[in-house]
């Protein structure tokens, strides 16, 4: 199974129940196709770069999951058939990229600690 992420945009004027229905439907598709659901984030309403179907704004959702190509095909088919979804895009993630993104955080923390230690040394020499 490979890791994927999908970002989809729904109409901005949907009610809470309709938005929950869409997110539940997406999670059900992943579960029915034996995928591994990781995360679903509601990024909220944002202005679109250009009007889509006469909408200037849309509510963005970020989805991360493990699955195969059949799962992607079924998920995109269901999103395409739903009139409330105005755009979607799925991307396959590489494991090396996901791990590499976590490594700079550790490096930045180590550099911050070293910087703090150097500041203490400089402060100590100034006080003497």
From Swiss-Prot:
Transmembrane segments: none annotated. GO terms for molecular function: small ribosomal subunit rRNA binding; structural constituent of ribosome. GO terms for cellular component: cytosolic small ribosomal subunit. It comes from the Bacteria. It holds the Pfam family Ribosomal_S6. One of its GO terms (biological process) is translation. Keywords: Ribonucleoprotein, Ribosomal protein, RNA-binding, rRNA-binding. CDD domains: bS6. SUPFAM superfamilies: Ribosomal protein S6. Binds together with bS18 to 16S ribosomal RNA. HAMAP family: Ribosomal_bS6 (MF_00360). Belongs to the bacterial ribosomal protein bS6 family. This is Small ribosomal subunit protein bS6. It comes from Geotalea uraniireducens (strain Rf4).
């Amino acid at each position: 199974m490979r890791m994927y992420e999908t970002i989809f945009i729904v109409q901005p004027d949907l009610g809470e129940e309709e938005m929950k229905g869409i997110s539940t439907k997406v999670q059900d598709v992943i579960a029915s196709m034996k995928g591994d659901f990781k995360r679903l984030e509601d990024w909220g309403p944002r202005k679109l770069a250009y009007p889509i179907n006469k909408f200037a704004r849309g509510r963005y959702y970020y989805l991360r999951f493990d699955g195969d190509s059949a799962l992607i095909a079924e998920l995109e088919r269901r999103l395409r058939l739903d009139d409330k979804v105005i755009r979607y895009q799925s991307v396959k993630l590489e494991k090396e990229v996901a791990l590499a993104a976590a490594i700079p955080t550790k490096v930045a923390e180590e550099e911050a600690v070293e910087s703090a230690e150097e500041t203490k040394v400089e402060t100590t020499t100034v006080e003497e």
